[in-house]
Amino acid sequence: TIQVVTRTIQAHDHRTNLHEAGQGRPVVLLHGSGAGVSAAANWSKVIPELARNFHVVAPDIAGFGMTELKPDARYDIKLWVAHFIGILDALGLEKVGVVGNSFGGALGLATALSHPTRIDRLVLLGTPCGEFPMTDGLRAQLEFDGTIEGMRHAVSFFPHDDSIITDELIQRRFEAATQPGALEAFRKLMPAPAGDERPTVRGIPLKALATLPHRALILHGREDRVVPFERALDMHRSVPNSELHSFGQCGHWVQIEREARFLDLVTEFMARD
């Protein structure tokens, strides 16, 4: 069996929690941004599988999971990119493949655009881009109110078939989201939308994506209620060297809802010369 090691490193002045396993070509898994999210919540089942072929690193991004949140730091894409690069530097990783889920995909893209030599290629799952009206699924994440019912409501938008949502999963995310300081941290990282207007969500601009030199594999659930499938089409049209694989009857959790296919596609893509 593959040994997954969880440890703490210093990266960009943040005490950083990460999971690591396997040998070979380095692949970094970047988690999404809902309440109670962490690398473990997004990736625990796929880390040992991907580690059969790759050196897998799955960090908790600054402010999320068990990684430090500094009360006086300004958490924005600039800080998150600097933290990600800090992780690569701390681990001595010159160039890595990235698998990014949702917000993690946007972070991977932002890093690839600002530090192109550090990123080898990208797998983007349910990743926002361009501009689009706030979805009910995104709003439910941002409006999480600190109750177990609120968590159940927020998580209900992720999969297409919500029978995969277990009480244990809700409980685990709820505990993570309500540990001391976590709710305040989440409010700081992801401010709730004001009033009931439909604010615009802004991802990486499509014009910027058109300049991306990297290969990208875009994976998206057709029924995604958090980041609509149309985003994947726009991304595929914009990123010159991209391929798109869409799953029917699948929501925002491709790596959980279509785990076997996800593993096959990512393994094949990351192993290419």
Give residue spans per PLM region.
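Acidic catalytic loop of the alpha/beta-hydrolase fold
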Residues: E223-V227
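Conserved HGGG/HGGXW glycine-rich cap/lid loop of the alpha/beta-hydrolase fold
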Residues: H14-M66
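Active-site loop/oxyanion-hole signature of alpha/beta-hydrolase fold enzymes
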Residues: P48, A58-V99, D264
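Conserved alpha/beta-hydrolase catalytic His-Asp/Glu region
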Residues: D145-A210
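Gly/Ala-rich beta-loop-alpha elbow adjacent to hydrolase catalytic centers
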Residues: G100, G104, G108
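Catalytic active-site module of serine/aspartate enzymes centered on a nucleophile-bearing elbow/loop
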Residues: S242-D273
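Short beta-strand/loop motif that positions the catalytic acidic residue
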Residues: L212, I218-H220
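Flexible "cap/lid" loop of the alpha/beta hydrolase fold
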Residues: L109-L113, I119-H153
